[in-house]
Amino acid sequence: MIGKSMRKIGSLLHRAKPSDILDKMREYINLSESKDIAKSYAAGFILHYALDRSCHPYVYALQNKMVEKYPHLNSHTAHNTIEFSMDTYLLTKRLKAENAYLFDTEGTIIFNEAELDELAKMISYVTSNVTNKQVTPNDVKTAIKDLKYIQKLTIDKSGKKENLVKIIDGIAAPFLNNFKFSALMRPKDLEKAKKYGNIERKTWTSPYDKLKRNDSFEDLFEFANLMQSI
């Protein structure tokens, strides 16, 4: 999108300690005049964190295995391939989506102007304080609107977009350390998507605590849901 890139700041925020982020969210909520909106966003962040904390050991274990087997595979591409494949699998199984690749993710990002204003102020406050990089509310608004636009853009009813993106990948990947944009699109092939979910519950090793486990991705998803309900 037109404007300054927030990618590096986003990476800093992604690597920040969750406790630091939550502390700044608490600070902001105490100052906010729209506490209900701010609390709602904070609750969503906590739910997202619970899901990542539960599922990421498996995702990174498989990502590392894929990169070890295929040294030229970009680690981010491997990560995206796993997560978007699981999107296809869970949307099909849980929401009975007939064509998961057509699921309207843009339609799940809903807000009115008051909510957008509050979210922009909150994310600006948290990000600026956690990363020590200046991020304005307008920067945040642009990022949120860009996210909605990208979600809409990746809906591919005819298959033409995927074909075009793969052509772009072929041209650009050598200059981007083999990063592939096509990995950001949910796969159409459900059987292929399933292969990334450890449905057979084979043993894998967590890269964090080195413990051997045999959970499937769906097992970890269920555990995250259980933690969220406590």
Protein language model features and the residues they cover:
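N-terminal leader/auxiliary helical segments
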Residues: M1-G44, Y49-I230
